[in-house]
């Protein structure tokens, strides 16, 4: 499968690396080229894996291969950027599977009503901690 990931922070880099190691075609789009150092060197060296650009800008999304993407993942630190990029991927570029990171779990239902898969690290971490507390 072909994945386009916007954001190469800790979450984006981890997701991108895992998918790449599974043999998927992965392109990571980030405004800061220094963030690509979170990726393994052999992954960074592969042609077309990293691209400096803004995932909310249509031209940069096109350069990154949005038209051929099976999945778009928005994992920027800012919810507003993730929401904008994810909506463009889903509704303008017709990407079938769009996953959007949201820091504020109260917005999750709204994003899901827009047809996006919304993932909240805050919610996920809280659930893991509660699970650990209750299993003690």
Where are these predicted regions, by residue range?
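Cytosolic regulatory regions of ion transport systems
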Residues: 1-136
């Amino acid at each position: 499968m072909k994945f386009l990931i916007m954001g190469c922070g800790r979450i984006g880099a981890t997701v991108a690396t895992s998918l790449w190691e599974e043999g998927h075609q992965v392109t990571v789009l980030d405004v800061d080229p220094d963030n690509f150092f979170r990726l393994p060197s052999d992954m960074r060296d592969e042609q077309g894996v990293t691209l400096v650009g803004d995932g909310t800008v249509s031209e940069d999304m096109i350069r990154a291969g949005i038209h051929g993407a099976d999945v778009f993942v928005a994992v920027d630190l800012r919810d507003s950027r993730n929401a904008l990029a994810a909506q463009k991927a889903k509704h303008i570029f017709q990407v079938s599977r769009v996953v959007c990171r949201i820091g504020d779990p109260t917005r999750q239902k709204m994003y899901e009503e827009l047809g996006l898969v919304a993932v909240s690290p805050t919610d996920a971490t809280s659930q893991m901690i509660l699970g650990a507390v209750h299993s003690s």
